[in-house]
Amino acid sequence: GLLGFVGSLLGGLGI
């Protein structure tokens, strides 16, 4: 999500 790590799973905004 955010930068392509855990954020991707929660946010889904990035890689």
Curated annotation (Swiss-Prot):
Isoleucine amide sites (modified residues): I15
Domain of life: Eukaryota
Keyword RNA-binding carried by entry: no
GO cellular component, one term: extracellular region
GO terms classed as biological process: defense response
Record key words, sorted: Amidation, Amphibian defense peptide, Secreted
Disulphide bond pairs: none
Cellular localization per UniProt: Secreted
Tissues in which the UniProt entry reports expression: Expressed by the skin parotoid and/or rostral glands.
Reported function: Caeridins show neither neuropeptide activity nor antibiotic activity.
Entry protein name: Caeridin-6
Organism field: Ranoidea caerulea
